[in-house]
């Protein structure tokens, strides 16, 4: 049976795109995703929510000179709708919001073009957005931007984000007063009277499902009703995310909510809030990301959908950069460049021979100082890992001027290239051997832990038994349990940790986080 072509249906207040597998409905001209029909489910999105609270791009912004990470929350609504591509193989539509001086102090001074793409035979849809600030516009700060989907709570109960991080989650109702007890911050709630008693006594906290950018390429939800259905957020590249590969961001959490976070100050603070001045021109493409839908045959284990989503993620990664986005602001592979070389560590106190940078992190980022990539949040970054011999290839880099940055697990400090590297379309640059000399004043006398930027080797205590997420019991991510900061003073009531070199074991004797003590006043 031939695969039917993609059809576009335009109405006064809605736009519907149908490829025979799914029907995607968006408000016109707002560009809010109001409906996703798939596999005989009329709408995967939460139908009890207002249409503007189902699938949307949003941001948090503030006036120039403001400090902190808060500001005005804005669900981005378009003011004009345009058809960019309408063919049997592809439909791409645009919902644009233009800024004018009459909107000063009311809206963030950005032109925002939200795009949605449906392809023939494709079980899902793509979205990306183009943000542009013109040179003569006023300044602003941008604390956050993301794409959010609110799924049906009566359907999607099983969340998966990694092979060892997946579980049934409670209902959003369980977080409300009477069923949930607020804890130290609003996101953390103790479930005292949940609708389903098996969740009683658990802590629900969306931050417990955060993930490093480098590890957050697919996450989402499974509806276990037969036939089972999955909804997945696939991020095929990290080039448009801020903060580098070890920046943590939110993923999926109780709602059921699924996020693609492009820019966020979570876990970092104001350093990761870009500040734009008057007279500063800026443009950035966030995405595309892929919302993948899959279904299981009757009788199949619904968790198979997670395995299938991982396979699809691999396909999307291999397809990057996509060939089909119509915007000229998204360069295709032949409009990008490539960099290759080898990273070597030179440390005579470890070895008289050069040391291959085994599984080091190396990336191109905007010009700056060593380590500045961690705070860079306006432009693009391109990261990869070296192999066991230190060799690396960074493919499909946007044209421009960059510094090359790196760090190597097992060695302290940051590498930075001495000179700028200019990437040009279609050009491959071979930089040869790069030498990194870690900073030191002499031989290592002693050290606590392993310099790999994870703290995974240190002592993580068991949580208070009253505040447990069962997912993280005896788990590599047990540091995500609620309230561990309070355990420090309980374990060391008379003073801070005393670590004795040569006797103490950092796996047992060094608390994984440096936290303040609670001061009690009677």
Predicted segment positions?
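Beta-strand-rich N-terminal accessory domains
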Residues: 1-60
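Short loop/turn motifs at secondary-structure junctions and domain boundaries
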Residues: 7, 108, 374-377
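Short, ordered beta-strand-loop transition motifs
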Residues: 7-16, 28, 82-90, 386-388, ...
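Extended, loop-rich substrate-binding clefts of extracytoplasmic carbohydrate-active enzymes
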Residues: 9, 59-136
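Broad, structure-driven detector of short, well-ordered beta-strand segments within folded domains
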Residues: 21-28, 113-118, 229-234
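Solvent-exposed loop/turn segments at secondary-structure junctions
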Residues: 23, 31, 43, 98-101, ...
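Structured domain cores in non-transmembrane regions
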Residues: 48-91, 160-183
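Long luminal/extracellular ectodomains of secretory-pathway precursor proteins
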Residues: 78-81, 102, 118, 125, ...
């Amino acid at each position: 049976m031939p695969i039917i072509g993609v059809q576009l249906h335009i109405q006064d207040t809605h736009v519907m795109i149908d490829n025979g597998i799914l029907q995607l409905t968006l408000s016109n001209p707002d560009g809010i995703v109001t409906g996703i029909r798939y596999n005989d489910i009329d709408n995967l999105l939460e139908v009890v929510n207002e249409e503007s609270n189902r699938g949307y791009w949003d941001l948090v912004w503030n006036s120039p000179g403001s400090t902190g990470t808060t500001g005005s929350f804005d669900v981005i609504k378009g003011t004009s709708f345009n058809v960019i591509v309408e063919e049997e193989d592809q439909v791409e539509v645009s919902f644009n919001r233009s800024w004018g001086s009459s909107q000063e102090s009311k809206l963030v001074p950005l032109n925002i073009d939200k795009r949605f793409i449906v392809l023939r035979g494709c079980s899902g849809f793509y979205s990306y957005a183009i943000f542009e600030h013109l040179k003569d516009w006023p300044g602003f700060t941008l604390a956050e931007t993301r794409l959010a989907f609110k799924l049906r709570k009566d359907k999607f109960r099983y969340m998966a984000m990694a092979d060892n991080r997946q579980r049934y989650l409670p209902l959003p109702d369980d977080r409300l007063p009477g069923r949930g007890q607020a804890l130290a911050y609003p996101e953390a709630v103790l479930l005292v009277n949940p609708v389903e008693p098996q969740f009683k006594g658990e802590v629900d906290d969306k931050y417990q499902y955060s993930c490093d950018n480098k590890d957050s390429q697919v996450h989402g939800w499974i509806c276990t009703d037969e036939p089972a259905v999955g909804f997945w957020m696939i991020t095929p590249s990290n080039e448009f995310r801020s903060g580098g590969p070890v920046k943590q961001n939110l993923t999926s959490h109780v709602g059921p909510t699924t996020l693609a976070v492009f820019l966020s100050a979570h876990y970092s603070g104001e350093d990761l809030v870009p500040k734009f001045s008057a007279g500063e021109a800026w443009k950035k493409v966030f995405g595309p990301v892929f919302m993948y839908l899959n279904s299981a045959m009757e009788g199949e284990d619904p968790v198979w959908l997670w395995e299938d989503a991982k396979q699809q993620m691999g396909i999307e990664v291999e397809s990057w950069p996509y060939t089909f986005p119509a915007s000229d602001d998204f360069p295709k592979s032949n409009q990008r460049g490539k960099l290759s070389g080898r990273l070597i560590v030179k440390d005579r106190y470890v070895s008289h021979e050069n040391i291959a940078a085994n599984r080091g992190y190396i990336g191109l980022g905007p010009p700056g100082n060593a380590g500045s990539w961690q705070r860079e949040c306006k432009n693009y970054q391109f990261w990869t890992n070296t192999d066991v011999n230190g060799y690396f290839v960074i493919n499909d880099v946007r044209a421009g001027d960059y510094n090359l940055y790196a760090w190597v697990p097992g060695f302290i400090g940051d590498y930075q290239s001495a000179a700028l590297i200019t990437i040009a379309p279609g050009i491959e640059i071979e930089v040869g051997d790069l030498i990194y000399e870690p900073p030191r004043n002499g031989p290592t006398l002693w050290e606590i832990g392993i310099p790999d930027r994870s703290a995974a080797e240190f002592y993580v205590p068991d949580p208070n038994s009253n505040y447990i997420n069962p997912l993280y019991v005896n788990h590599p991510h047990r540091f995500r349990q609620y309230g561990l900061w309070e355990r420090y003073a309980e374990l060391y009531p008379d003073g801070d940790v005393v670590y004795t070199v040569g006797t103490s074991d950092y796996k047992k004797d060094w608390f994984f986080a440096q936290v303040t003590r609670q001061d009690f006043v009677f």
